[in-house]
Swiss-Prot record:
<feature type="binding site">
    <location>
        <position position="56"/>
    </location>
    <ligand>
        <name>glutathione</name>
    </ligand>
</feature>
<dbReference type="InterPro" id="IPR036282">
    <property type="entry name" value="Glutathione-S-Trfase_C_sf"/>
</dbReference>
<comment type="similarity">
    <text>Belongs to the GST superfamily. Tau family.</text>
</comment>
<dbReference type="InterPro" id="IPR004045">
    <property type="entry name" value="Glutathione_S-Trfase_N"/>
</dbReference>
<dbReference type="GO" id="GO:0005737">
    <property type="term" value="C:cytoplasm"/>
</dbReference>
<feature type="domain" description="GST N-terminal">
    <location>
        <begin position="5"/>
        <end position="84"/>
    </location>
</feature>
<dbReference type="Pfam" id="PF13410">
    <property type="entry name" value="GST_C_2"/>
</dbReference>
<dbReference type="InterPro" id="IPR040079">
    <property type="entry name" value="Glutathione_S-Trfase"/>
</dbReference>
<dbReference type="InterPro" id="IPR010987">
    <property type="entry name" value="Glutathione-S-Trfase_C-like"/>
</dbReference>
<comment type="function">
    <text>Conjugation of reduced glutathione to a wide number of exogenous and endogenous hydrophobic electrophiles.</text>
</comment>
<keyword id="KW-0346">Stress response</keyword>
<feature type="binding site">
    <location>
        <begin position="68"/>
        <end position="69"/>
    </location>
    <ligand>
        <name>glutathione</name>
    </ligand>
</feature>
<feature type="domain" description="GST C-terminal">
    <location>
        <begin position="94"/>
        <end position="228"/>
    </location>
</feature>
<dbReference type="Pfam" id="PF13417">
    <property type="entry name" value="GST_N_3"/>
</dbReference>
<feature type="binding site">
    <location>
        <position position="42"/>
    </location>
    <ligand>
        <name>glutathione</name>
    </ligand>
</feature>
<dbReference type="InterPro" id="IPR045074">
    <property type="entry name" value="GST_C_Tau"/>
</dbReference>
<protein>
    <recommendedName>
        <fullName>Probable glutathione S-transferase GSTU6</fullName>
        <ecNumber>2.5.1.18</ecNumber>
    </recommendedName>
</protein>
């Protein structure tokens, strides 16, 4: 049982990776202290807790740091397993289904993450941005098929409830909203990926995601400009 002060999460409000952890903590109804980090002036606690990558999220459990979002999510699910206290499971109980979920979660970060970064931060020309958008669209079309495989006709990748792949992909949804405004069309297009579009609505509507997954595209795009300025100043 997570007692008062036992769990502390270091994050950034817009980070897809911190969002994943917050969603899972909410799913498990675990009380935690959230500490908003300033990426332009990282705290001593963050630097000491994640000296390798110096990045968020970091989950401090009784003072001990756990790093990297997918690792943190699985850690939470192991320490506070499904069924205990009526908590849901994030990882499937079946070893094969668990392996499949890990495969698709890895696919999201292998394929969606670089496209997301390129669209928002790495594209110097419209041609480069268009290529990154095409990369993201191709990955999402593959995930449309994966949704059918994993969900087995149920509402989420995890079946009846939010699971590992839902959390991993769901962390990006806020920035997808910003990208939609930036490029003038939807990345998760109901005409092209109808199952994913319906899934997005269901995921955003969950109590665990409300107030955690950003929905203000203008605020995100403004923060993007801040990140670009920080990056430019470091390059000088």
């Amino acid at each position: 049982m997570a007692g008062s002060g036992e769990l502390k999460l270091l994050g950034v409000w817009s980070s897809p990776y911190a969002i994943r952890v917050r969603v899972v903590l909410n799913l498990k109804s675990l009380p935690y202290e959230y500490v908003e980090e300033n990426l332009g002036d990282k705290s001593d606690l963050l630097l000491a807790s994640n000296p390798v990558h110096k990045s968020v999220p970091v989950l401090l459990h009784a003072g001990r740091p756990v790093n990297e979002s997918q690792v943190i999510v699985q850690y939470i699910d192991e320490v506070w397993p499904g069924g205990a206290g009526g908590r849901p499971s994030v990882m499937p109980s079946d070893p094969y289904e668990r392996a499949v979920a890990r495969f698709w979660a890895a696919y999201v970060d292998d394929k969606v993450r670089p496209a997301w970064l390129a669209i928002l931060f790495g594209s110097k020309t419209e041609e480069e941005r268009a290529a990154a958008v095409a990369q993201a669209v191709a990955a999402l079309e593959t995930l449309e098929g994966a949704f059918g495989e994993c969900s087995k006709g149920k509402p989420f990748f995890g079946g009846d409830g939010v699971g590992f792949v839902d959390v991993v992909l769901g962390g990006y949804l806020g920035w997808f909203t910003a990208i939609d405004k930036l490029i003038g069309r939807r990345l998760i297009d109901p005409a092209r990926t109808p199952a994913l579009a319906a899934w997005e609505e269901r995921f955003r509507a969950t109590d665990a995601a409300k107030g955690v997954v950003p929905d203000d595209a203008d605020k995100l795009l403004e923060f993007r400009q801040t990140l670009l300025r920080w990056s430019a100043s470091k390059a000088k």
